[in-house]
Amino acid sequence: MTDALAASQDAITQARIALEQIGRHLAGKVGVERRVDTQRLNRVQPEAFQVARHLAQTTAAEAMLQWARNHGEHEHELTRLYCAMTCADLSRWTRFNEPQLGLKVAGFDGIDADFMTEMLATERISAIGQAVIARDSLPAGPYGHSETHQMVQQQFARFSDEKVAPIAEETHCHDKLIPEELLQAMGELGVFGISIPDEYGGMFMDHRTMIIATEELSRGSLGAGGSVITRPEICAKAILVGGTEEQKQHWLPKIASGEHIVSVAVTEPDAGSD
């Protein structure tokens, strides 16, 4: 790790230590004979949800640190900012939830606290934003895509610009249903089958392809674009892991073609769909 990223690495390491401490504490509350008791888990569901969220953010920060190591100052600065945001978010949550957790959590002191304060200053964030805006291309730095992934990105970017973005504002502001014509066009593009193996009528390549497609559709509209690709992915993965072969043969081709449109019903403790 270069010196330019040393403070970021130190702070994220401390975040990982704190989360492991909380995770062990919660595991002691929900575990029975080395298994999770769902009733006990339900009693600490908000805390478990937050631990999962902060773990995801911390893991993303660790991946970003690895990525930035191979690039320059612009990428370093973006990475430092994300690491600081991740640690500050975790610090706020632990500080106000220690009584609920029943645990004194290892905090961010000294150098780590100074790092967060420095990176989250308004002037620093503004300077990073201006640097992103000023770049003619790759505002967030190079992705490192292969030629195939670049082609996927271009294809979905074009579709998002031409088909999704023009209806995004109307759909969102007036709470309209996604037009049938857009769903049909998505089916023809293979949007619904991008997470389904070809033996079941899909066109799964790899998870990076799914991420690229989701990002480009979300750029056009999260509601009318990005969310449409994640719903069949959630359902397809559940069927692939837990379904019988008969269920896979019956449902997956219909999902991949768009014949059956998938929706989800979820609950998030203390969040939007609670």
What residues fall within each predicted segment?
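FAD-binding core of flavoproteins
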Residues: 1-27, 31, 140-147, 226, ...
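Intrinsic disorder at enzyme termini
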Residues: 1-19, 91-156
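Extended amphipathic alpha-helical segments enriched in small hydrophobics
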Residues: 4-71
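Long, hydrophobic, amphipathic alpha-helical segments used as structural scaffolds
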Residues: 23-26, 30, 34, 62, ...
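Secondary-structure capping and boundary motifs in well-ordered enzyme cores
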Residues: 39-57, 75, 79, 148, ...
